[in-house]
C-alpha cells in the first residue's frame, strides 16, 4: 500500500476513485459528492455511486464525520476501507478540515486502508493480492498530512509484521524462526540485535528453561536495541514479550478443541518485535530495547510436571502447580534479565490468561502495573488510537492467593481473579523498576470466520512511545 499527498481539490472527471471525507456543514465543490452528502439519512455517514466519464464509470463516495474523535474516525475509516478494496487507486479529499484535524483524519483513514489491504496467503496455491494499492490524500495542509501518513505507514508496517508472525503456522514459526526473523527485521532497519541460545538459558534462567526443556525445539532469548535519544546513555524503555510459539499446555494438557489457535500464544513477542521495528522505522528520539523469550510448551518425558520446583533467574523458587501457566515462567526470567538495562520503564506483553477474556472480552486488553504514571500513559495511548485497554487492580492482598508450602511462590494462585494473580506473580520480578503488564489474551487474535492475528496492541504501544 502506497500513500502520497497532493494539495489540489478534487474535481469531477478527475482520474481515479474519489472519496470525500467531510462534516455535515462542508461546502463541497463537487456536484456528485454534494448530492451524496445531501442524500445521507439520519444515522448514515457513508454513501457512494458511480458516474460516467470518458474512461468508463468512476467511483465516488462521501464519508460524513459526526465526530473527529479517534473511535468515530476509526469506525468511519473502516467503512470507507471496505468500499476502497474494490478500487486500485483512491483519491481522498480532506480539504474540509483544518490542519490538525486533516492530519488526524488522514492518519486514521490510511491505517484503515493499509490494514484492510492486508493478506496472509503464502501457504495457498493461488494467492489473491489486494486490488487496492494506492491512496492519495488531498489537503491544503500537505506537510501535516504527509507526517500523519508517515506515522500511518509505520503503524501499518508494524501491525502487518505482527500479523504475519502470528498467522504463521507453528511448524514454520518455531522459536528459532521467530528469533531469526526478529534479528533480521531489526538489522534491516539499522538496529542492533542479539540472539542468546540454549546454553545461557539453561545455566542462568531456570524457570524459562523448565518450560523449554520439554520440546525438541531449542529456546531463544532475543535482545533488540535502538538508541535514538540525543543522550545515548539515557535510561531506555524496555518491552518484554512472551513468545510461546505453540502451547499444548504441557503435561497439564489443553483440550483438543481449538488447540490450533495456540500458535497465537507468541503474539506478545510478535507485538514487541513489531512495535520495536515500527519505532525504529519512525526514528523516534528514544532509547528502546526489546526482550523476547521464546520456546514451545510441549508434553514429553523431559517436560515440567505439576509439583516440580524450579529456580528463577532472580533466585526465587517456583512450585509448578499447572504446566499450562507457562507464560509467566518464561516472562519472569525475561523481566529479571531486563534489570541490567536500568530501565526508565518496562512493559511486558503476553497472551497470559483466559481469565482476561472472561473479565474484559475480546475487544479490551488488560493493564496492570506497579507505577500508576506508567499505567496512565498506556491508558492515554489506548484512548488516543482507540486500541482499547482497561486497568485491573494489583492490591497487595492478591499476594495472599500465591502461597506455597514447598517454594517461595507457586505459578498459579487460588481460584478467582486469575488475570490479576498472574500479574501479581510477575510483580515479584519487577520490583526494581516502573513496570506495566498488558494481558492481550482476548485481543491478539480473532477466531471463527475472521480467524487470524489482529496486530494489537501495536497501535497502543507505538502511540505510547511516540508521546514519550
From Swiss-Prot:
Record key words, sorted: Aminopeptidase, Cytoplasm, Hydrolase, Manganese, Metal-binding, Protease
Enzyme Commission number: 3.4.11.1, 3.4.11.10
InterPro entries per the UniProt record, alphabetical: Leucine_aapep/pepB (IPR011356), Macro_dom-like (IPR043472), Peptidase_M17_C (IPR000819), Peptidase_M17_leu_NH2_pept (IPR023042)
UniProt cross-references to SUPFAM superfamilies, sorted A to Z: Macro domain-like (SSF52949), Zn-dependent exopeptidases (SSF53187)
Main location: cytoplasm
Residues reported to bind Mn(2+) 2: 242, 247, 265, 326
Name of the protein described by the UniProt record: Probable cytosol aminopeptidase
Organism: Neisseria meningitidis serogroup A / serotype 4A (strain DSM 15465 / Z2491)
